[in-house]
Amino acid sequence: MNISAAQVKDLREKTNAPMMDCKKALTEANGDIEQAIVILRKKGIASAAKKAARVTSEGSVVSYIHAGGKIGVLVEVNCESDFVARTEQFKELTHDIAMHIAASDPKFVRKEDVTPEYMEKEKEIYRDQAAKTGKPAPVIEKIVEGKMAKFYEEVCLLEQPFIKEQTISVGQLIATTIGKLGENISVKRFARFKVGDVGETVAISKASNEGEAEAPAAK
């Protein structure tokens, strides 16, 4: 199938992916631009997984103030080099992550950061709710698993649907940027403050403490 220059240009404007990658994705998708976007995202996530072992020791701390000064966020996002940290794509990513935290109020960076105590407390609540249905224990555990998956989406930054594009998670957003920039990127920690709240949300990723990367597996 012949792919026109206009199609390639359109896809590049939508994704910021290299021209050659856009053409290959369009060819694979038989000219369907929406399918080509999906293909590019999947390749970006796969690329992120390959880079997941690389150490991220550069990056930046970004602030975001929202709602007339009532909500504030500080977030540290790391990458491999100062060169990437200065790129517009990285700056846009960090701004979007900070804005997302302000709007969505996550409690943890990754689901692996959820403490055992916090996790068990939620599981017990879901078990009690499911037990009232009178269903057998194996079915109840399946129900609990499903509710925990939803729970992670609600409280873990990387699992949450991205506030500006609900069809992808924040983790997938980061993975796509990794694919574009060619370096591993990880969220190390964040703090969220809201006027009137007692205390603040402070989250530090265990992965960052242990020198691991945060790229999610391809779905």
Curated annotation (Swiss-Prot):
SUPFAM superfamilies: Elongation factor Ts (EF-Ts), dimerisation domain, UBA-like
Compartment(s) where it occurs, according to its Swiss-Prot or TrEMBL record: Cytoplasm
Keyword Cytoplasm: yes
GO molecular function, one term: translation elongation factor activity
Major location category of this protein: cytoplasm
Keywords carried by this UniProt record: Cytoplasm, Elongation factor, Protein biosynthesis
PANTHER family: ELONGATION FACTOR TS (PTHR11741), ELONGATION FACTOR TS, MITOCHONDRIAL (PTHR11741:SF0)
Described function: Associates with the EF-Tu.GDP complex and induces the exchange of GDP to GTP. It remains bound to the aminoacyl-tRNA.EF-Tu.GTP complex up to the GTP hydrolysis stage on the ribosome.
Protein name: Elongation factor Ts
